[in-house]
Amino acid sequence: MGFRTLDDVDVTGKRVLVRVDFNVPMAQGKVCDDTRLKRHKETLLELQKRGAKLILLSHCGRPKGQVEPEFSLHPVVQVLEKIINQPVNFASDCIGVAVQTAVEALQNGGILLLENVRFHSGEEKNAGSFAEALAHNGDLYVNDAFSVSHRAHASVEGITHFLPSYAGRSLQCELQALEKGLGKPERPVIAIVGGAKVSSKLFVLNHLVKKVDYLVIGGGMANSFLAAQGVCVGKSLCEHALIETVKKVIEKARECQCTLLLPVDAIVGFRFEKDAPHRLYDIGDIPEDGMILDVGTRSIAHINAVIDKAATLVWNGPLGVFEMSPFDQGTIAVARHAAELSLTGKLVSIAGGGDTVFALNHAGVADDFTYLSTAGGAFLEWMEGKMLPGILALTQA
């Protein structure tokens, strides 16, 4: 990747605008999950130690270009202070005279968190005037948020046109990990793609069949693939309108010599609810009144056997309705098997996306994977092979 990093700049006494991702879940004005905050610890402490004046930019939620108190970043301050063990100042806006005054008051090593950039409509419109107003408070810019780099927004892309721009350590680390996944991976490579709908991951599937040796299709989207092969899927979620499109993906996989793995058996429920009546069926025997809610034991064994042969695993999306017991067992079993191989150094495992992170935490193995990306949309677009606007901007800055 042709961009500059923190190794290429002297930050002492400089006002450094750092784009972080503090879009964290909150309830009653309190942060519920600080995972994303922790991802930026290395970058922030390095800049602070090197005597920079840190000004942090982030969004939170979707306030639609106006001030909505429930999306304020103020509750983040106290949690961030504990994580980095440093005082953090807060500004009630992200541009304007009050911000300028707060920035001028910063000492070397001082940290200032600005209010939600999405409180201004210019952020999501990538308005040049708003990007310039943000840039006015800095001498240089650091993007440390891979998870927002698929957005051509003012604090991600627009600002790079006004300031010398660099990649932060978290962004660097993420890109290096992802390069091991699909850029220059150890082979064989297996990808697991799950989730409810094929329609949301068509671009991903079409890209992956060209890049990986084995492609496991799980979750609700597997039903459309089974239906495309003439399998009766009963009352299971199935996008019948996409059957012809799915057939093209199957054909493309064959042309690219990518082995598709579909369920050979399934846990079938008769109501869509936790602990609903259920039993194991071979895939050719799904009853008309049943719903496929998880992969079966033979399917798990097939997937694990392929993981045993693989050197690299890329995972996005659960294999079943993991939010409801007992339909989480397929995802848990495969996740634990992959984690075990990762811990012994036999497998490079990279997983990403909100549901995937949640599922791996649920399985108790999130920390055992080689790399876990907290990015949702950015991770998917990377899996599609797209160059992300925020990353492209750094290569051109």
Swiss-Prot record:
Substrate binds at residues 21-23, 36, 59-62, 118, 151. Keywords: ATP-binding, Cytoplasm, Glycolysis, Kinase, Nucleotide-binding, Transferase. Its EC number is 2.7.2.3. Gene3D superfamilies: Phosphoglycerate kinase, N-terminal domain. One of its GO terms (cellular component) is cytosol. GO terms for biological process: gluconeogenesis; glycolytic process. Pathway: Carbohydrate degradation; glycolysis; pyruvate from D-glyceraldehyde 3-phosphate: step 2/5. Monomer. GO terms for molecular function: ADP binding; ATP binding; phosphoglycerate kinase activity. ATP binds at residues 201, 323, 353-356. It is found in: Cytoplasm. This is Phosphoglycerate kinase. Belongs to the phosphoglycerate kinase family. It catalyses: (2R)-3-phosphoglycerate + ATP = (2R)-3-phospho-glyceroyl phosphate + ADP. InterPro entries: Phosphoglycerate_kinase, Phosphoglycerate_kinase_CS, Phosphoglycerate_kinase_N, Phosphoglycerate_kinase_sf. Its main location: cytoplasm.
